[in-house]
Amino acid sequence: MGWFTGIACLFWGVLLTARANYANGKNNVPRLKLSYKEMLESNNVITFNGLANSSSYHTFLLDEERSRLYVGAKDHIFSFNLVNIKDFQKIVWPVSYTRRDECKWAGKDILKECANFIKVLEAYNQTHLYACGTGAFHPICTYIEVGHHPEDNIFKLQDSHFENGRGKSPYDPKLLTASLLIDGELYSGTAADFMGRDFAIFRTLGHHHPIRTEQHDSRWLNDPRFISAHLIPESDNPEDDKVYFFFRENAIDGEHSGKATHARIGQICKNDFGGHRSLVNKWTTFLKARLICSVPGPNGIDTHFDELQDVFLMNSKDPKNPIVYGVFTTSSNIFKGSAVCMYSMSDVRRVFLGPYAHRDGPNYQWVPYQGRVPYPRPGTCPSKTFGGFDSTKDLPDDVITFARSHPAMYNPVFPINNRPIMIKTDVNYQFTQIVVDRVDAEDGQYDVMFIGTDVGTVLKVVSVPKETWHDLEEILLEEMTVFREPTTISAMELSTKQQQLYIGSTAGVAQLPLHRCDIYGKACAECCLARDPYCAWDGSSCSRYFPTAKRRTRRQDIRNGDPLTHCSDLQHHDNHHGPSLEERIIYGVENSSTFLECSPKSQRALVYWQFQRRNEDRKEEIRMGDHIIRTEQGLLLRSLQKKDSGNYLCHAVEHGFMQTLLKVTLEVIDTEHLEELLHKDDDGDGSKIKEMSSSMTPSQKVWYRDFMQLINHPNLNTMDEFCEQVWKRDRKQRRQRPGHSQGSSNKWKHMQESKKGRNRRTHEFERAPRSV
């Protein structure tokens, strides 16, 4: 099948898809969409594509002081330079052959499970890290020396000191783990058995006896999947500090009709050492509450996003009240969506001070507890702030008994403004990770979210107030593909010092800058329309915004994105012959079809077309119909007529600002003139055309005939029939082709001659019809 006919058939399929999708709105799309190739060509991504004998780059630890990113993977621990991850050190930490064979004999996959997958990577002190891995279903931990100072350049495993990793790392590499190391003590949420059924929140290491949640009690934990753990002060007294765990779990019996997943936040006191007679070596201050992330639906039925995927804490001036960002997805296999919800710690504390969930038996519903709550209130840390108890071992028996039977709160925690700040339901991906950066802009502070997806893309989103700062709308600035192949993003870290973002997946690690101001354009209006808090117009280019720069030359409007007000160069916006205007000349054949391509850089811009007849100054808006069809890629003109000759102006309209992107001059050649040029047997150019046609190979003549047939049959409704005829003829020719019966020597000679022929060929007659 010829080149042109193949392209024509492909174009027909793309055209139908484009026509169907054009009616969709542009409000929920990224303003800029950058492919992996575009990211590479613009030097906006650096990738570490992994090692042949490693994978699963899921466990991140950021060290801004040393300018290193530590990454735990399969059988390896890496130390990447934050400036450029191409510069790295590695530690090889595999399991022994004996452990691997035991894992294999237990029925596990020798490649995907019988290895040492690093699950815990925490800073132990100023000179060492603490690392734990699955150890081929035999968890193991050790220390890694990193030196006192960054210039020490030390990164080595202490292979003389290994510890049992039970209660620190899961056995199964597929299970999630949340860990936090404080004052030499490791807090971890994980599974503590080979079968992956005994889930618990542990505290190990240190000088105290290990402590955990109650075992085999679904009221405490019901098949949880741990996401993250964070230390948050409760007051100015360090004795009141609490560790909060974020996880998702199956709903408790009676809490929901049918099987459901709930997102949770759990709390424990840092100075909890268990009970004296009851709950010995068990948490006595553990409480949990449900996190709600939902949107109102018809008939009062809300759509819930219950699958908690990731959590990020944005610190504020008050360390006791960080903002909690959570990424959620739906549990349904039919309706797939993602959401980001934002929570305040004051709302969390209010719920933990509210009523406890209670029911009298298995056949009863959960209700708020109405009886007397013992003193001190269960969940309160023993300190001088809230009572005279020095230790949880001194708590009265009724407090311990109540805490054991009432670990859940009745009221849930609702997000700020009672709704998500971002929802995505009409895309082929789901959110997996989130990090947030607080950026100072000309008109205030903005939180910029970087959201990872399960297809290897990163979304850059900024929340902008509509009327007040309490009523926010999200603006999707960019969608960036950061890996060559689609892969789930499983880890993200943000370096404010380096202004870089680091992304982990099964395939490798990627690094990209937080801002790419130069890609927005070379005009003030384009920079202003981007609404990127990192960027501002400095008088000559779109560059990084610095609050300390001279205010006189800066142009930035994140809240409204209004270039008409802020840019002084807009007096030239109606000059169609400006330096940024692209001009093209296209030739079309009468009664055939042609396509005028025009795609603005911004996917949020609306395209507006005008037509200017030859030798006329007046421009008129192009009206769509059967003759002219608009797609997202441009204009399709069917059955060209001589009157279609003229200038076509493509404008992009965004936020009330119109910019001319392209001027296309269309010249329509009448059919009689073309036939005369192509088939004329007279001397001159006609003889040259005839000579060219006679010198064509049979396959080239078929291609030429297909082209003429397309010209003489411009009705695109028969395009699929035409393509089917070409494909049938091509298959028939392949079936009728004689078999090759030559010997190996003749075959080799034929290949050599063919190769020489290809090298001498100029390809002059294989060009597309337009170039001919």
Swiss-Prot record:
Sequence ranges assigned to domain Ig-like C2-type in this UniProt record: 579-665
Chain residue ranges for the region called Disordered: 729-772
Database matches in PROSITE patterns: IG_LIKE, SEMA
GO CC aspect terms: cerebellar climbing fiber to Purkinje cell synapse; extracellular region; extracellular space; glutamatergic synapse
Predominant location: secreted
Single GO MF descriptor: semaphorin receptor binding
SMART domains tied to this protein: IG, PSI, Sema
Residues with attached carbohydrate: 53, 125, 591
SUPFAM superfamilies in the cross-refs: Immunoglobulin, Plexin repeat, Sema domain
UniProt keywords, alphabetically: Developmental protein, Differentiation, Disulfide bond, Glycoprotein, Immunoglobulin domain, Neurogenesis, Secreted, Signal
Subcellular location, record wording: Secreted
Signal peptide: 1-20
A single GO BP: neuron migration
Annotated S-S bridges: 103-114, 132-141, 269-381, 293-341, 517-535, 650-723
Gene3D superfamilies: Immunoglobulins, ligand-binding face of the semaphorins, domain 2, YVTN repeat-like/Quinoprotein amine dehydrogenase
Biased composition (Basic residues): 729-738
Record remark on domains: Strong binding to neuropilin is mediated by the carboxy third of the protein.
Purpose: Plays a role in growth cones guidance. May function to pattern sensory projections by selectively repelling axons that normally terminate dorsally. Involved in the development of the olfactory system and in neuronal control of puberty.
Protein name: Semaphorin-3A
Organism from which the protein derives: Mus musculus
Lineage, top ranks: Eukaryota, Metazoa, Chordata, Craniata, Vertebrata
